[in-house]
Amino acid sequence: SDDPAFPGALLTPYSLAVLPELDRVVSTNSSMDEVNAFSGVTYQVWQLSTLKLLKTAYLDVDKNLYGHISPEEARVGPDGAVYIQTLGCGIERITDVDRDQPRSKLVYTFPGSFCGVPTIVGHYLVQSVPVMHGLIVLDISNGNKPVEVSRLKLNDGFFSHWTGWDAKTGRLVVTGDHARLYLVKLDQSTGALTMDNAFHDANGKPGFDFANRKWPQGWTGTGQPHGVVFSR
């Protein structure tokens, strides 16, 4: 990821989106190190077949001056553009990656900061937004002008972070800073979110409680779920 044209930039690969039909990969540059957490401001375009670095570019800066900072998760949208979530709670839309000059545009900014892992389902982008303790759904049918269509607060004080989609059940899994995992229903026709209250454990509260459990390896204690994927 080193690029002599960007000697002072943080060029630490964080995530990537693959576009095989264009023979391209788009990667983000951000850091898990707290010291450099808010230093990343670039993305890179690679040739998939050779893994040759084709372009390093700065993300679009909007009037709020922070929505572009720390690009993290990259996702391919229904329009073929790459949507990048930032720690500054922005959504950057990357286009023209098969040309000499790819383009970046900050198309949306969520409230707060430290937004986490997004999920795209059809033409909806689901974003974890810690400051509102839940999720916000954008309709990205018009990628240049996303529109909020729904939001769901999961729990007072819940610092939402990870989202993942299961097409078989039509459910999103959500984790955060609590010892609890939630399942959320997504209406794919409207983008509306609702809690799956049928998914609960012995305490009767929505979600699965990881606190004070006896685990298969013999350890008893509290686990905090983080990254979650569904089996196929």
Describe the residue ranges of each PLM region.
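Feature marking well-ordered beta-strand scaffolds used for ligand recognition
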Residues: 1-232
